Regions:
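Bacterial N-terminal signal peptides
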Residues: 1-3
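Activation on beta-sandwich/Ig-like modules and their edge loops
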Residues: 5-149, 156-160, 171-184, 190-200, ...
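Catalytic cores of secreted or luminal carbohydrate-active enzymes
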Residues: 157-169, 427-444
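Short loop/turn motifs at secondary-structure boundaries
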Residues: 445-555
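Basic, gly/Ser/Thr/Pro-rich low-complexity segments located predominantly at protein N termini
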Residues: 154, 166-170, 263, 438-440, ...
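Signature of Gram-negative chaperone-usher
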Residues: 144, 170, 496-500
Length: 555
């Protein structure tokens, strides 16, 4: 009697269960790339005509082969069959995809074109610095939870470096409690919006237009996108316009296990070209703690929706040329007006060292440009290679009383003041954990144009690093340009304690910051101080102003 096998298959009945992307250096398996498939169902499957693929192409069809229930098969290129046959059942395909060591998106497609399973693996999934260098496989933990993503994968524990054609060495039941969530949305044209989820969604619920509504517009079509099924593409009745925001409300969407996502909202909008000053550098950690990572926080200081996949992060080499250009995001990701995003190489490490109030505002880049501990350049470029913002920083900008700046971020004080103004940067407050990634800086202050000649804000300040009134700002307004300034600070006895500015050039308005230190960079005692400001020009005009300020400290 002929064996029964399924003609029509359910998605995830056959899954990708093990990946050998980097076989060298050899641990105990042949020096060949391969993918292992497992039949998780209770019906045999004929793999004839099935194909594997990645972002660069699709393999030739698989041969006539019956994959029995709860069994495995190794798929590879023809030249690897002999070497891998010693470990299990092997079939070959032409044009076997070249598996990238750092990560790739691979998929399994049935003869009828249905995507049965897809994996967007990354080298970070090994969770082991040694094993990710080669010779070890990535194994799926629980084949009955094929949608769980990185939580369901880890490096093999087998002494050979993998378990081709056999039960995985880390096989087990995954206690996955991660709920389906809409991460973000972006417009890929004026009338199409993609919603990105954290895991695959059920195709039928994802394609029901009644499950979506959008402010000041309506949805005419919804499509769940293969091969990962973690995006839904909406077609809109009316085209979107630039510099407008819309809210998408999502209801009744299921994940691949049938769990319903609670009602949720995400923002979206049409991206605009990013010009100079639209996105600014807002915070930088260039000397992390041991085993830590640099980070750069950027801020959208415009009314535009900015696509981070069109921006790059870079530095300058010793000759002063732009170098080490790194694209911020490999996929569309919008930065909305007034929003922050933090760029780093390791989100988990960032959360271990700092309070990350908005984890969804962390973008993990494979590598950041080098930002040395003492001085360097942070450069943001747009799609045309134009400089959007640049900071030439130095560790001398840290608060002078800090003995060790390791793990302390430099924060921008006012987003509307020039990036390169050293007075516009200050060490992050100790009470904020020495860094504020993904939210407003501890030293944040907006300077507004004030009436009068000099104004000191605040009138009482306490330079103790707690993030509250650590800096005194001496703000001036002048009737015309062309003046030179001298700012001198006296104690109550009339002695000069700080020559804050000497022959400083001015505009019609501006400011200088004082951190409470004297000319020898020593902390001054509490008390009342007099700020004396002189402004003069080459035509002999002169303006003199005097004001007082109180320096306070915690008792």
């Amino acid at each position: 009697m002929a064996a029964l096998f399924a003609i029509s298959q359910n998605r995830y009945q056959v899954v990708i269960s093990e990946i050998m992307a980097d076989p060298s250096p050899i641990v105990g398996l042949p020096n060949n790339e391969w993918i292992e498939l497992k039949n998780t169902g209770n019906t045999a499957i004929n793999l004839a005509g099935w194909r594997l693929g990645d972002l660069t192409g699709t393999s030739g069809p698989m041969p006539n082969f019956i994959l029995e229930p709860d069994s495995y098969v190794i798929v590879c290129t023809g030249s690897a069959v002999a070497a891998l046959s010693a470990f299990g059942t092997v079939i070959s395909v032409t044009s076997f995809p070249s598996l990238d060591n750092d990560g790739d998106q691979i998929f399994l497609r049935a003869v009828n074109g249905t995507t049965m399973h897809a994996v967007n693996y990354q080298s970070s999934w090994y969770n082991n610095e040694l094993k990710k260098e080669g010779g070890w496989t990535l194994e799926m933990i629980d084949p009955l939870q094929p949608c769980a993503g990185k939580e369901n994968w880890n490096a093999s524990n087998h002494q050979n470096g993998g378990t081709p054609g056999a039960v995985n060495s880390i096989n087990g039941t995954l206690n996955n409690t991660t709920a389906l969530t809409a991460i973000h949305a972006y417009a890929n044209s004026s009338n199409m919006v993609n919603i990105v989820f954290n895991q695959p969604v059920d195709s039928s619920s994802g394609a029901a237009i009644g499950n979506y509504s959008i402010s000041n517009n309506s949805v005419t079509q919804a499509i769940t996108l293969a091969p990962l099924f973690n995006q839904v593409q909406l077609t809109l009745a009316q085209p979107l316009t630039e510099e407008s925001l819309h809210t998408i409300t999502i209801n009744n969407i299921n994940n691949c296990k049938g769990q319903v996502m609670p009602a949720q909202q995400v923002k979206t909008g049409l991206a605009s070209v990013c010009n100079t000053g639209d996105v600014i550098i807002n915070e930088i950690l260039f000397r992390p703690r041991p085993n830590g990572y640099d980070y750069v926080e950027i801020y959208n200081n415009s009314k535009k929706n900015i696509d981070l996949s069109k921006l790059s992060l870079s530095n300058r080499n010793t000759s002063g040329s732009i170098a080490n250009i790194k694209t911020i995001s490999t996929t569309p990701l919008l930065l909305y007006p007034g929003d922050f995003v933090v760029l780093t190489e390791n989100a988990d490490n960032l959360s271990l060292n700092y309070l990350v109030k908005h984890p969804d505002k962390v973008v993990v880049m494979t590598t950041l440009p080098s930002y040395p501990n003492t001085a360097g350049n942070v450069v943001i470029l747009n799609e045309q290679g134009e400089v959007v913002d640049e900071l030439a920083y130095t560790n001398k900008w840290h608060f002078p009383l800090i003995d060790n700046d390791e793990g302390i971020a430099l924060e921008r004080i006012d987003p509307n003041q020039p990036t390169q103004n050293s007075s516009n940067w200050h060490s992050a407050a100790s009470t904020a954990g020495y860094g504020t990634p993904t939210y407003q800086n501890s030293q944040h202050k907006l300077f507004e144009t004030v009436k009068g000649n000099i104004t000191i804000m605040p009138k009482v300040f306490s330079p103790d690093g707690d993030g509250f009134d650590d800096i005194a700002s001496i703000h001036y307004t002048l009737p015309e340009t062309g003046f030179v300034a001298n700012i001198t600070i006296f104690d109550a006895a009339g002695r000069i304690v700080k020559s804050l500015v000497r022959n400083g050039t001015t505009s019609t308005s501006g400011y200088w910051n004082w951190n409470g230190l004297d000319d020898k960079n020593k902390a001054l005692p509490i008390g009342t101080y007099v700020v004396f400001a002189e402004f003069f020009n080459l035509q002999g005009k002169k303006h003199s102003y005097k004001s007082t300020i109180v320096l306070a400290r915690r008792l």
